[in-house]
């Protein structure tokens, strides 16, 4: 949908960041209002404006996020290594996040969204502002993730919808105006 259509708001509702003004939302059978902790265990979220700690090192940040999800010790080390490999952060893992390009920051955001191995990924404009090479890499990663997880993404780029999506939902002023398979 267009700017202001309600895409980001809907994503914030699904991820339990804000409550709906009316209606209900369930994620894998869990109500976002009544069972928000269960929903949060199952959802990974990459917001449009990726809130990263710029003074932290990549590996340090992923360890911090793992701790938030109660992943510690060897399990945390294993997940961090898996996320670094999956997102192509190997050469950047010892750098401060503030020193990374936008493309690598997006990769850090994806890694943090997946650190707890959620079954649902919610990505709000995950390729906005990326250069052509970064765009290809991130789209490939999202496509691969879609083979094993449910991925909900918002975008204004129709080529991205065609490249990444099986289904499209168009929202305008908070109302679904189209909902169909591609």
Regions found by a protein language model. Give the residues of each.
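Helix-to-loop junction immediately C-terminal to a conserved catalytic motif
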Residues: 15
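Conserved ABC transporter NBD signature motif
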Residues: 23-31, 38-39
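Conserved ABC ATPase "signature" region
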Residues: 63, 67, 74-92
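Catalytic Walker B motif of ABC-type/P-loop ATPase nucleotide-binding domains
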Residues: 121-124
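Helical segment within the ABC ATPase nucleotide-binding domain
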Residues: 135-147
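ABC ATPase "signature
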Residues: 179-180
């Amino acid at each position: 949908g267009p700017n202001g259509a309600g895409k980001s708001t809907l994503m914030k509702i699904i991820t339990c960041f804000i409550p709906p003004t009316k209606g209900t939302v369930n994620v894998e059978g869990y109500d976002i209002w009544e069972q928000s902790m269960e929903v949060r265990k199952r959802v990974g979220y990459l917001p449009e404006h990726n809130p990263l700690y710029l003074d932290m090192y990549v590996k340090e940040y992923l360890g911090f996020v793992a701790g938030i999800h109660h992943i510690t010790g060897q399990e945390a080390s294993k997940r961090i290594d898996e996320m670094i490999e999956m997102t192509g952060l190997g050469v950047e893992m010892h750098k401060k996040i503030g020193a990374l390009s936008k493309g690598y920051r997006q990769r850090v955001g994806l890694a943090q969204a997946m650190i707890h191995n959620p079954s649902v990924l919610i990505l709000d404009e995950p390729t906005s502002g990326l250069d052509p090479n970064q765009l290809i890499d991130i789209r490939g990663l999202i496509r691969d993730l879609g083979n094993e997880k449910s991925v909900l993404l918002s975008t204004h780029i129709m080529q991205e919808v065609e490249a990444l999506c099986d289904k499209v939902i168009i929202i305008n002023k908070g109302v679904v105006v189209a909902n169909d398979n591609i």
